[in-house]
Amino acid sequence: AKYMFREVLGIDFAEPFRRIPWIEAMERYGSDKPDLRFGMEFHDVTDRVKGHGFGVFDDAEYVCGFAAAGCAAYTRKQIDALTEFVKRPQVGAKGLIWIRVEADAVKSSVDKFYTPDEVRAVAEACGAAAGDMVFLLSGPKFKSLTQLCALRLEVAQQLGLRDPKTFAPLWVVDFPMFEWDDQTQRFYAMHHPFTSPKLED
């Protein structure tokens, strides 16, 4: 891979490519091929948000979110557009929860169910600071992570963070051998089972 970068693009990577276990890639970025050119890592806030009477979170297996730096200035129109984005069939989320973090206040779409201190604690758990916006999705764990990944990439695109001339190569390792498909109700090999076998499989 380094040879191809060097010969085709004239880019020489001196350091070894980063390696990330599959489960870490999924939990931090929602993808088995994560874009590492920018941050916006995911955070599990399930335990922080359950038990407050908000059924969407109380009934969910998993609640996760990320902080988008500088996005507290997003207008209602921009937030609504992102909500419609995640509700598209291609993404499949039922809605989007947001937290606007300012120096002296926090505002969220679920203020009815949480105190300002509770909302701020969730925002801080997602790594947010003043001037940031936090976006949260909930549902089955890996479905929510995948949906949040689509949102992460969309927000990064809007912020100009996905520079096609910048590269952040990595190897994702330790893939599960099989994955379950809800539609066909059966297991499928996640990748060709003989390309990178593990002894425990």
Question: Can you name each region flagged by the protein language model?
Answer:
Residues A1-D201:
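Class II aminoacyl-tRNA synthetase catalytic cores and aaRS-like
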